[in-house]
């Protein structure tokens, strides 16, 4: 993960910094849903990438106890029956999808402890690396909001310019 540049997707708490690869975290927390308004539906994002997702979870589970947090509405077996992780189901409005809230309910961080967190989409990157031997930072994003003419899901590489994505899809002159 370090050599491939993917370790930077792992965040250490407290302090929300890139994780120390030499540290032994109390646990690794992956939230597979987001209750923020306009957030992408992870079950849609996951379609066709279930194998990479599980491989990514397997890799994380070798580093520390790993928790996969899902929403009560999610039904994809890749989430509900994920292997080598502790699956916890959450219900409720925002901030139920916030990984910090989830950590506080499952295993609060005590003085001197650290935990690592990842976005579920980033777990797919890790799985792809182990399944293919190459880094592929393609991700599906939701193009949504009041200034979007036609809401849609778009596939792009992390760091890609959004100019082409916005072209013809958002209100002209909108302050984006």
Enumerate the predicted regions with their spans:
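Buried, small/hydrophobic-residue-enriched core segments of structured protein domains
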Residues: 1-176
């Amino acid at each position: 993960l370090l050599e491939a540049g993917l370790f930077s997707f792992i965040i250490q708490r407290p302090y929300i910094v890139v994780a120390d690869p030499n540290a032994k975290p109390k646990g690794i927390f992956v939230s597979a849903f987001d209750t923020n308004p306009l957030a992408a539906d992870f079950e849609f994002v996951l379609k066709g990438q279930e194998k990479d997702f599980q491989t990514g979870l397997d890799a994380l589970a070798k580093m520390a106890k790993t928790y996969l947090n899902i929403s009560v509405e999610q039904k994809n077996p890749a989430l509900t029956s994920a292997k080598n992780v502790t699956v916890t189901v959450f219900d409720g409005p925002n901030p139920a999808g916030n990984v910090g809230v989830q950590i506080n309910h499952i295993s609060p961080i005590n003085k001197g402890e650290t935990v690592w967190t990842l976005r579920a989409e980033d777990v797919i990157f890790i799985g792809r690396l182990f399944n293919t031997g190459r880094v592929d930072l393609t991700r599906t994003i939701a193009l949504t909001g009041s200034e979007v003419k036609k809401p849609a899901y778009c596939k792009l590489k992390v760091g890609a310019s959004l100019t082409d994505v916005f072209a013809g899809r958002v209100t002209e002159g909108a302050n984006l």
